[in-house]
């Protein structure tokens, strides 16, 4: 157990002993009704939180129980998007977009109209926190008279501009993208409504300004495409405004005037842009000739603007960013990325909301945040109760390559696992997609080669991706894994299985739709990597299987306990 966990346990036990003594004294104290107050047993009071944590493998920070309990109470009290503070047209577009991406294959629902969309735990917790109105009591309606009123007005203006920092941490595949985009789009729409109600000319002038209002940064171009496509899809959704907006709001003159404006009818009508792989700086600058509401990109693409010799002040367009999301923050704040990420953040001088979003909270990430924001109270943490727990709908199986007939060959073990999955009768009629993770990119190509040449798999069924694979080629190879499973007869290659061999590069944030099988060819180096790899299946409460192949070198006794950890819902540390 790490020193961090040891300290927590010691503090917990110390506090519990005081509680035991307190209850022991009360145990014999008579109440008015002559009843005895029973003391909780010492075993109950001193039982610490169970954690699956071993030596250097342990890389995850344990959030405070108080933070998790706060989220739990909010989650239990809300079961509908209508109960959350979301701008009405944003809510309508979001629900339709979520339905659009739902996989209806192998379900009893005939259409998306039969599907009731409910917010996930992280969406409830994050939207409630981030969308809380700032406590601003402005005196703008009249001229401040006294010194106290002037001071109050200045404080209100300062609070309106003050940076708020949020962290969102929730299990993989839990709907984190909408957990941060719903509040962001809501605030953009509310600001537009405020400008429109000042005057239509003020609103029109703001829309024509060459600025970026909100920024989402991610570590890879695949993730840029993924988030951009979600936002663009929501922006493209059409609906009758008077049917999706509460009649009470439409009777409010402030909402009615804005929502009935020609550029607000029947959709979001936002300007969503991406600055991704292969895009020149000219694509970005041409897109900012009028206001960009949301830009999705990587820190590297933004920092690359510094190399431009023929563009005057290329970063000036970022001076007005008010909302920024650092998605896959555990990656973007690690040693490989942190310089580029923090350089981008320093340019956002007018940012009001800064959101760090991640599926895990590595210890290193927590230390980095503490250095950036030494006052712990300046960060608002949003964690779900299931954080750092492998979902119970995922079945984990350990395969020992040391036993017969594998005789120490992990590759033979993998080939047999692929054969067994191919013939196990699951996903009948559909192409089975399987992800295989290795630790080193140098092992990807040789493994693909041996699976084809030695074990008789078709070349079109086994593909490999590393950081060296060109973006356009990567996009084509990934396509079958990023959409719902196809019927075998509809697949261009008539494949019954498709296998992707890759590294942790593809384990971060990628929404592999409906993937049922993940194989860990190599034992992950840390618990952080384990959670991300396992999280490519079992997304959005769907079932999945994870096969961990071990041999003499990696067959440590503790990893064999992983299936039991999942069944008992134990936190991974």
From Swiss-Prot:
Organelle targeting sequence: 1-39
EC number: 3.6.4.13
UniProt: ATP binding residues: 170-177
Cross-referenced InterPro entries: DEAD/DEAH_box_helicase_dom, Helicase_ATP-bd, Helicase_C-like, P-loop_NTPase
Motif (Q motif): 116-123
Top-level taxonomic group: Eukaryota
Protein name from the UniProt record: ATP-dependent RNA helicase MRH4, mitochondrial
Source species: Meyerozyma guilliermondii (strain ATCC 6260 / CBS 566 / DSM 6381 / JCM 1539 / NBRC 10279 / NRRL Y-324) (Yeast)
């Amino acid at each position: 157990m790490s020193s961090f966990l040891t300290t927590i346990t010691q503090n917990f036990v110390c506090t519990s002993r005081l509680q035991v003594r307190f209850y022991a004294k009360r145990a014999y104290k008579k109440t008015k009704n002559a009843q005895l107050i029973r003391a909780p047993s010492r075993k109950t009071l001193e039982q610490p939180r169970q954690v699956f944590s071993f030596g250097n493998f342990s890389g995850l920070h344990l959030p405070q129980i108080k933070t998790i309990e706060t989220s739990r109470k909010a989650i239990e009290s809300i079961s509908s998007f209508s109960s959350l503070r979301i701008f009405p047209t944003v809510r309508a577009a979001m629900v339709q977009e979520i339905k659009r991406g739902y996989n209806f294959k192998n379900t009893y629902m005939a259409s998306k109209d039969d599907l009731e969309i409910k917010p996930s735990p992280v969406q409830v917790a994050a939207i409630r926190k981030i969308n809380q109105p700032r406590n601003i009591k402005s005196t703008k309606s009249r001229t401040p008279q006294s010194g106290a009123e002037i001071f109050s007005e200045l404080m209100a203006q300062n609070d309106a501009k003050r940076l708020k920092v949020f962290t969102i941490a929730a299990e993989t595949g839990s709907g984190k993208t909408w957990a941060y985009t719903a509040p962001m789009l809501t605030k953009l729409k509310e600001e537009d409504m405020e400008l429109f109600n000042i005057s239509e000319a003020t609103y029109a002038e703001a829309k024509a300004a060459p600025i970026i209002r909100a920024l989402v940064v991610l570590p890879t171009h695949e993730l840029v495409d993924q988030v951009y496509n979600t936002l663009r899809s929501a922006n493209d959704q059409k609906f009758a405004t008077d049917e999706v907006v509460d009649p009470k709001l439409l009777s409010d003159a402030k909402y009615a005037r804005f929502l009935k404006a020609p550029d607000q009818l029947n959709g979001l009508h936002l300007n969503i842009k991406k600055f991704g792989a292969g895009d020149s700086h000219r694509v970005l600058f041409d897109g900012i000739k009028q206001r960009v509401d949301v830009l999705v990109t990587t820190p590297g693409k933004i920092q690359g603007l510094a190399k431009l010799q023929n563009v005057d002040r290329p970063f000036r367009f970022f001076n007005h960013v008010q909302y920024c999301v650092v998605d896959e923050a555990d990656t973007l704040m690690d040693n490989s990325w942190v310089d580029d990420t923090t350089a981008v953040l320093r340019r956002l001088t007018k940012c009001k909301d800064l959101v760090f979003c991640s599926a895990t909270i590595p210890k290193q990430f927590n230390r980095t945040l503490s250095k950036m924001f030494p006052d712990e109270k300046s960060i608002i943490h949003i964690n779900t109760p299931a954080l750092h727990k492998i979902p119970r709908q995922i079945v984990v199986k350990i395969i020992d390559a040391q036993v017969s007939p594998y005789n120490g060959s992990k590759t033979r073990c993998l080939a047999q696992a692929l054969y067994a999955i191919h013939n196990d009768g699951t996903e009948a009629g559909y192409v089975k997609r399987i992800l295989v993770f290795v630790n080193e990119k140098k092992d990807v190509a040789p493994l693909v080669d041996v699976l084809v040449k030695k074990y008789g798999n078709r070349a079109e069924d086994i593909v490999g991706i590393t950081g060296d694979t060109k973006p356009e080629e990567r996009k084509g190879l990934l396509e079958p894994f990023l959409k719902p499973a196809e019927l075998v007869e509809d697949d261009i290659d008539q494949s019954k299985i498709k296998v992707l061999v890759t590294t942790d590069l593809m384990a971060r944030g990628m929404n592999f739709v409906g993937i049922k099988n993940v194989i860990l060819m190599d034992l992950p180096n840390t618990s952080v990597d384990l959670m991300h790899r396992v999280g490519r299946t079992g997304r959005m409460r769907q079932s999945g299987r994870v096969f961990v192949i071990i041999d003499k070198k990696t067959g440590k006794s503790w990893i064999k306990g992983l299936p039991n950890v999942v069944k008992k819902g134990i936190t991974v540390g």
